[in-house]
Regions:
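Short beta-strand segments that buttress and anchor functional surface loops
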Residues: 71-75, 198-205, 214
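Membrane-embedded beta-strands that build the outer-membrane beta-barrel scaffold
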Residues: 212, 225-227
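Secondary-structure transition motifs
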Residues: 2-6, 52, 72-185, 218, ...
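Outer-membrane beta-barrel translocator/receptor signature
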Residues: 207-210, 220-222
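N-terminal type II signal-anchor transmembrane helix
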Residues: 1-51, 115-116, 122, 224, ...
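Short extracytoplasmic
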Residues: 48-73
Length: 349
């Protein structure tokens, strides 16, 4: 009897020892090997497939809580110029991924992402190669009409982002910066007809604002929501046009808010409604003139009831209201009005 009891105790000790050993091995694999494997494979993929460089700071994974953390990542050109970076990425996965046969993430949080978006003189974009592999996979999936993989994300948040944009196709490079950028996505699912709620907000260095929120479905692909652009400066528009117009947009702001409804299946349908488009304190000068005095000042323009339907290729505007407009004109030696030069320049352009 004693020998049997001792044998049972020995087996228990052996089982506990094996279990403890497996836990230690599991912990070592999760804490040490997986972060190393992720770092090596990520850098190899970026180097060999994308022809870029990837630097990663601290990479850690907790195999007991399924929490992945990556800090101080930087994607760069071969020349060393930065394409994108972020301060911190945290992904909290769930064990439910196993029995739900889906990628289930409780939370994804990206802090301080920084993207340098450059349009080269030939029209190419510096991030084109980043989506090359994904495009091949997407094309193959489209040919076979394979369903999307099941993905569920409880919350995805992007905090304090920044995008620096440079367009080198212009006569002089046009630059603009959006910061800070915030984005939130809640209860995301790729399930059929599931509505995913999102909210996006950004501000330019000039104080111009963009807010975009609504819902979208992954299957079929579609979206509806509302958007708002506030205090878009006339100077920003003029800086981008760079002399394509005979007039210069010297002052003023443009603001509007609207709603949209987009469907991509079975055909593209897009309806946009703009209840009011507001132009405030617009001032226009002649670009070629030696003085900088405005040739036209319009304190207030309101365009109301604008409806755009892509499906029927129709645009409707209910009302255009102009208040307090002042135009400065003089008669030239040939008897024509000075403002007629603007229409002549436009025709030549």
């Amino acid at each position: 009897m004693l020998r049997a009891l001792l044998a049972i105790l020995a087996l228990h000790r052996l089982a506990l020892g094996i279990a403890a050993g497996l836990i230690v091995v599991y912990a070592l694999v999760g804490f040490l090997w997986l972060p190393h494997l992720l770092r090596v494979n990520a850098q190899k993929y970026v180097s060999e497939e994308l022809g870029r460089g990837l630097a990663l700071g601290d990479v850690s994974f907790n195999p007991f809580t399924f929490r992945l953390s990556i800090r101080d990542a930087k994607l760069s050109e071969k020349s060393g110029d930065a394409i994108a970076s972020f301060q911190s990425l945290v992904v909290n996965a769930e064990l439910a991924s196993i029995w739900q046969r889906a990628v289930v993430l409780k939370e994804v949080q990206l802090d301080a992402p920084d993207v340098n978006l450059v349009v080269e003189r030939d029209g190419s974009v510096n991030v084109t190669n980043l989506v090359r592999a994904g495009s091949k996979v997407a094309s193959a999936a489209a040919k076979t009409e394979a369903p999307l993989p099941r993905v569920r994300i409880g919350r995805l948040a992007v905090n304090s982002g920044r995008v620096a944009f440079e367009d080198r196709t212009r006569p002089e490079p046009f630059t603009a910066t959006l910061a800070p950028i915030h984005f939130a996505l809640t209860d995301f699912r790729t399930d059929l007809n599931h509505e995913n709620a999102y909210d996006f907000a950004a501000q330019s260095s000039a104080g111009e604002t963009l807010h975009w929120s609504g819902r979208f479905t992954a299957q079929p692909l579609g979206s509806d929501g509302q958007f708002k652009i506030g205090q878009l400066r006339a100077q920003t528009i003029d800086d981008y046009l760079q002399g394509q117009l005979p007039i210069r947009l010297a002052d003023g702001t443009l603001s509007f808010a609207g709603t949209y409804n987009l469907s991509l299946h079975p055909t593209l349908l897009l309806d946009v409604g703009l209840p009011e488009i507001a132009f405030d304190n617009f001032a226009v000068t002649e670009r070629a003139a030696s003085d900088s005095q405005p040739i036209a000042v319009v304190p207030k323009i309101r365009v109301t009831g604008t409806q755009f339907a892509f499906g029927t290729r129709s645009i409707r505007v209910d009302k255009v209201q102009v208040e307090g407009a002042r135009v400065r004109a003089s008669r030239e030696a040939d008897g024509s009005l000075s403002v007629s030069r603007l229409t002549q320049s436009t025709a030549q352009a």
